[in-house]
Each structure stands twice: as C-alpha cells, then as structure tokens.
C-alpha cells in the first residue's frame, strides 16, 4: 500500500537530484534520517548514477534503480535481497501516463538526455546523450490525457529543445501536431535554449494554444563568460531573439548563474549592462557552486559568496520590476487573463495565467480546476488579484 506519511512507510523511494554538490549532500542526509527509523531506502533519479554505487556499497540504501529500470520498480520493491539495477543511459522511456492524481495539468516527457557540454553541468554525464521519445507515442499520450480532462499540457525533458534532432523531427513540428488535438487549451514548455528556436518553432508562435511565456536559458549575458562556461549561445544574438519575442507579446524567463569562476568585476559590469537590455519578466537565478566532476569545478573560485549574493539580488530586483511593469501594461491595454485554477489557498483561488504569473481570485463560486477568463483585475507588485 502507498501511504501519504513517509514516517509510516516500510519502504521509501528517494527520487534524487544531483545538479549540485549540496543536492547530493541533502539527499544523503535525508537517506540517513530514514534509515535511522528502520525503513528501507530505494534510491532513484540522477543521484542513482552519481552516488548510487557509493551509497549501495556502504549499505546506506537497500536498492538502486536507474531510469531505464523504473518499469521494474514494482517487482524490485518486493525483493528481499539488496539490488543495484542502474540500467543504461541509452534507454528511451516508453511508458504512457494517462492520469495525474490531484493535478489540474498533465506533464508529458518528450525526451531524455543532453548533448551540450556546459562547463558547470553534470547532467549529461548522469542522463546520457539526447534522445527523443517516439512522436506517435507522445501524440497518443496527449490524446488520452485530453480525453481524461487535462486540457493544459506541460512538455518536459532534460533538454526539450533538442527534441527530434535524432529522429528528423523538431520541437516546433511536435508542438504543431499537439496543438491540433481536440480538448487541449494550452501547452506549456520547460526550459529551451536560444539556439533551439528555429523556423519550425517560429511557425507556431502565434498559435492560441501556446503559452505566452517562454523560458529560454541564457545562463549569462557576458560574451566572455559564456565562452568560459562553454555555452553555445551569444549574448548579442540572444538579445535580438528576446526583443523579437517580446515584441509579439511573450513574457520571457531565463536561468542565470552568478559568481562562476572568472566573473571579474569587468565581466560582471558588462553582463549587468547587457542584462538590463533584456525584456525579462521571470528569473531562475542562483549563485554558482562547484559540482564535482565538471570542468568548472577544477577552476579557482574567485568570487566570494557575499559578492555573488549581492549580484543575485540586483538581477532579481531588475526582473521583479520588469514583471510588475509587464502586468501593468497588459492591464492598461485592456488585456484579459486566462487562468487555470489550481488550488484554494485560504480565501483565494490561485492559478497561473497565460504569461505564467500567479493570479489570486476571490469568488463565491466553485472554480477549482476550472478555466477563468478575467477581464478586470488589480495589479500589485506581488501579483494580480481578481474578484468574480
């Protein structure tokens, strides 16, 4: 039986992240805590590849399951003997998910792995080369999910913009086909790279079912820093792309790393001036921390933690102001918000609009899991509010 309280569980499956050293140490501490109360620990996720053998040999975990072996999880959980089933990094997930318990939207995994070689990232080593799921299988899954009432889909993967490179297709082509499925009102995307927005992707930018928010990973806005990071993008081309997308109404988010080795005051100043030119409305920004096994981890850390935090704060403030202005301008133009209501939090229903901004709604109606089209709303710095 599955229990909601892990303290009641005899077996706990830990789906681990390994993107940073702190993620590894956090997983290890969590595992030790579970073991102390006598439960069996099964390790899966990226940490199974990076730390699975070490933890298994130390008897810290009862079993290890790699991504390619997750179809065998039911049988493995019944095993009375310790097991190490890592599988391989070339497999393609063939599972079709038809239901997401307690979710208003559905997630479809379209690819696995990454062919990039960014200097700070361990993910290609633990997830393997980029490989695409079968396009017809993705479409079948989407049709079933739409039939089951999920009319917002979120496409996920390690590097979804690489979809189709190994099969002669593309993310744009896949999106075009998904958008024709009856019942689908909105398609959201995980993170994509600037270089992955090709002509086939541009062809679907004006489709009504495509979210009006794109998350495009810049990582930095200094040309010199991008070279140090072994990135494929160039700041000046990125700016052209972002301005183009902003002009046609997209809210734009990005990932950004501050404090990477080599981020001198001169490079930071250049990056900051460039950053201010980008019409960013959302930001996932973090201070660099060395990841064992990466090229960057062998470089001298020459930016202090305090300096990195200060730079982080500056970028967050810029984007927060941009986001506020973006929402104000949308309201002034008489624009409406299309919100899928996801939860009731106190007196407010909450959901995200087409620009991936949270909206709080007060109403006497039962609107959970419903779509709300909001024409009148109040824009505040912390979010948008409406009463219907």
Predicted feature residues:
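Conserved SAM/AdoMet-binding glycine-rich loop
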Residues: 41-42, 50-51, 55, 147-266, ...
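Hydrophobic, well-ordered secondary-structure elements that form the walls
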Residues: 216, 255, 275, 283, ...
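Proteins enriched for Cys/Gly/acidic motifs involved in redox and nucleic-acid/cofactor modification
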Residues: 1-162, 200, 214, 235-244, ...
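Terminal RNA-binding accessory module
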Residues: 298-388
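Short, glycine- and charge-enriched coil/turn segments that flank and shape catalytic ligand pockets
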Residues: 37-38, 78-84, 165-173, 247, ...
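Conserved beta-strand core positions
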Residues: 11-12, 106, 153, 187, ...
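Hydrophobic alpha-helical scaffolding
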Residues: 128-131, 190-191, 231, 261, ...
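Conserved loop-to-beta-strand segment in the C-terminal subdomain of adenylate-forming
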Residues: 291-297
């Amino acid at each position: 039986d599955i229990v909601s309280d892990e303290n009641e569980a005899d077996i706990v499956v830990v789906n681990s992240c390994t993107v940073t050293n702190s993620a590894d140490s956090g997983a290890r501490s969590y595992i030790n805590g579970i073991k102390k109360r006598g439960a069996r620990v099964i390790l899966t996720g990226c940490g199974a590849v990076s730390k699975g053998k070490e933890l298994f040999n130390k008897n810290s975990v009862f079993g290890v399951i790699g991504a390619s072996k997750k179809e065998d999880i039911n049988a493995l959980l019944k095993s009375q003997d310790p097991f190490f089933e890592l599988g391989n990094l070339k497999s393609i997930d063939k599972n079709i998910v038809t239901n997401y318990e307690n979710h208003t939207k559905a997630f479809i995994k379209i690819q696995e792995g990454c062919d990039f070689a960014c200097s700070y990232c361990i993910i290609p080593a633990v997830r393997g080369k980029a490989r695409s799921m079968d396009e017809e299988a993705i479409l079948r899954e989407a049709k079933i999910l739409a039939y089951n009432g999920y009319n917002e889909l979120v496409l996920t993967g390690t590097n979804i913009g690489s979809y189709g490179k190994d099969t002669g297709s593309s993310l744009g082509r896949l999106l075009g086909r998904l958008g024709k499925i009856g019942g689908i009102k909105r398609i959201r995307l995980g993170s994509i790279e600037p270089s992955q927005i090709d002509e086939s992707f541009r062809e679907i930018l004006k489709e009504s079912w495509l979210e009006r928010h794109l998350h495009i990973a810049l990582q930095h806005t200094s040309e010199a820093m991008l070279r140090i990071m072994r990135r494929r993008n160039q700041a000046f081309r990125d700016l052209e792309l972002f301005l183009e997308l902003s002009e046609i109404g997209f809210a734009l988010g990005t990932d950004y790393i501050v404090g990477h080795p080599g981020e001198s005051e001169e490079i930071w100043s250049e990056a900051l001036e460039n950053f201010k030119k980008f019409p960013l409305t959302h930001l996932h920004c973090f201070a660099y921390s060395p990841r064992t096994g990466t090229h960057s981890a062998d470089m001298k850390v020459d930016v202090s933690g305090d300096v990195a935090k200060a730079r982080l704060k500056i970028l967050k403030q810029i984007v927060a102001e941009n986001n506020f202005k973006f929402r104000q301008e949308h309201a002034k133009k008489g624009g409406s918000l299309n919100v899928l209501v996801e939860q009731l939090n106190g007196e407010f229903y909450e959901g995200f609009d087409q620009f991936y901004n949270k909206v709080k709604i007060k109403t006497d109606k039962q609107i959970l899991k419903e779509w709300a089209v909001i024409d009148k709303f109040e824009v505040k710095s912390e979010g948008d509010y409406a009463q219907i």
